[in-house]
Amino acid sequence: MSQSPIELKGSSFTLSVIHLHHTDPAIVRNALEEKVSQAPAFLKNAPVVINVAALSREINWRQMQQAILATGLHIVGVSGCKDERLKQTIARSGLPVLNEGKEQKNSADTPPIAALPVQTTAKTRLISTPVRSGQQIYAKDCDLIITSSVSAGAELIADGNIHIYGMMRGRALAGANGDKNCQIFCTSLSAELVSIAGNYWIMDQIPAEFFGKASRLCLQDGALTIQALN
């Protein structure tokens, strides 16, 4: 029996979600360009989802879409849209309007997360408290050391190496400025995504024998490799 030319399978992908809090396309573009410049190896030409939950129907979606695309990001969908007219406008622009998954808690009812206590040296940023879902830690021009757990939905970015001495369930992006010599060290690897200088694996790509284990990731011949951390 001949094989079917197509096959439908369920899968999951880890994408960055950009939450818009301003209706001015120029302001949004400048903010995005700054973010991309901080981590070009990961964000340049990256696929993203745009969340418009905080915006009103008065937004000029065509101009906003052009502003976002001008930064090099690729929009794969729009979430958080409650206004029917805005949904129709987005659909006419050729983008799917995505239904969001179950939220843990309404962000409007959640108090702002306090800044994490940080100790810094010339080449290391140290975080000694848990990194919770929705938090992003960026270690500019240095290594990042986390001595506690990292929740799913949290993001670690470092221009240098990343060390996690706890359960790692979020995303870890080392060598964000393009340094291919950077590494990721983790005592319990259950990450949603790991990346070194823009080369990344999502959760499904991490070899099963290393999941939940102490691991070291680095680049060899331009490809991600992993080995047990003793």
From Swiss-Prot:
GO biological process, one term: division septum assembly
Record key words, sorted: Cell cycle, Cell division, Septation
Keyword Disulfide bond (UniProt): no
InterPro entries xrefs: CAP/MinC_C, MinC, MinC_C_sf, MinC_N, Septum_form_inhib_MinC_C
SUPFAM superfamilies: Cell-division inhibitor MinC, C-terminal domain (SSF63848)
Assembly and interaction partners: Interacts with MinD and FtsZ.
Annotated function: Cell division inhibitor that blocks the formation of polar Z ring septums. Rapidly oscillates between the poles of the cell to destabilize FtsZ filaments that have formed before they mature into polar Z rings. Prevents FtsZ polymerization.
Family: Belongs to the MinC family.
Protein name as catalogued: Probable septum site-determining protein MinC
Gene behind the chain: minC
